[in-house]
Amino acid sequence: MNKVVLLCRPGFEKECAAEITDKAGQREIFGFARVKENAGYVIYECYQPDDGDKLIRELPFSSLIFARQWFVVGELLQHLPPEDRITPIVGMLQGVVEKGGELRVEVADTNESKELLKFCRKFTVPLRAALRDAGVLANYETPKRPVVHVFFIAPGCCYTGYSYSNNNSPFYMGIPRLKFPADAPSRSTLKLEEAFHVFIPADEWDERLANGMWAVDLGACPGGWTYQLVKRNMWVYSVDNGPMAQSLMDTGQVTWLREDGFKFRPTRSNISWMVCDMVEKPAKVAALMAQWLVNGWCRETIFNLKLPMKKRYEEVSHNLAYIQAQLDEHGINAQIQARQLYHDREEVTVHVRRIWAAVGGRRDER
């Protein structure tokens, strides 16, 4: 199996293709990307027969920015007979996967696929039973075994394959299912909530998103991101010349500072989180984020980089490299991740966590 399917946001296929070609090439897994505009997925076809499996094992999925999910597949199954779609699919997977831990029957995230998605949900139950009978799936779901993927691109037309549960997205179609809170000031709140799900392991939430932490929200108005911090019982400095939602001010957890987010300098030395969703050139935002991290003004940060119309992968890569270079120059070990989230549009969300510094900085790193 030499093909890897990567699901992405429709309209960002070129960026997804450029990224996987670049990062696979760095690991000497060479191939080419098949791209169809607004399809919501890319197929990276490796030149060597077993390189698809090698790619999804060796390249950390968390290092990808534009892919929501990935899995290795075989040849396209076409013209599945309506009276028996199951038998050909089972046949394709036998000998490829044994005792898989989960089945996901998926489509690309496009308007055209919505009707197909309804079929996929109904089709999952009988297909799961048949795959268990054939030994392709284990009798019970388990996160310790590979995930079996059946990816429909049209009625009666699908790819079959698998991903590794320790190196994929845990979410169906790579999309966390989040509900908009009725009392949130803006829909942007879902971006930060999704970022927490994507970047922070669930078993670390109690420690890293803890009650009583201090946080800063730069460009906070009207408070969509502040809302997520308040919801986790943090104390928040919300920095913006624009007004904050009264509902947030009434909690008593928010201090509104009428200042420019680019000029604000914190006076506290125990700020755990800084978040930022400002509409500004990505290079300017990246420089500000690097300043906060180098100076030890926060321990972790989540921020958005707005994307230009062209060369979007190159622009993001350049900004992330700049931040990494600044951290390296000052002897700071940090973890950097970036992802175009489901709730992002013409932007990517970045998470940076200071691990330790060679030079004494924050008290919690000494």
UniProtKB/Swiss-Prot annotation:
Which InterPro entries does this one have?
RlmM_FDX (IPR040739), RlmM_THUMP-like (IPR048646), RNA_MeTrfase_FtsJ_dom (IPR002877), rRNA_MeTrfase_M (IPR011224), SAM-dependent_MTases_sf (IPR029063)
Keywords of the record: Cytoplasm, Methyltransferase, rRNA processing, S-adenosyl-L-methionine, Transferase
Q: Which residues are S-adenosyl-L-methionine-binding?
A: S188, C221, P222, G223, G224, D240, D260, D277
Q: Where is the active site?
A: K306 (proton acceptor)
Reaction(s) catalysed by this chain, per the record, are:
cytidine(2498) in 23S rRNA + S-adenosyl-L-methionine = 2'-O-methylcytidine(2498) in 23S rRNA + S-adenosyl-L-homocysteine + H(+)
EC class: transferase
Enzyme Commission number(s) of this protein: 2.1.1.186
**Protein name per the record:** Ribosomal RNA large subunit methyltransferase M
GO terms in the biological process aspect are: rRNA processing
Species name: Escherichia coli (strain K12)
What PANTHER family does the entry give?
A: RIBOSOMAL RNA LARGE SUBUNIT METHYLTRANSFERASE M, RIBOSOMAL RNA METHYLTRANSFERASE FTSJ DOMAIN-CONTAINING PROTEIN
What does the UniProt entry say about where the protein is found?
Answer: Cytoplasm
Q: Which GO terms describe its molecular function?
A: rRNA (cytosine-2'-O-)-methyltransferase activity
Name the domain of life this protein comes from: Bacteria
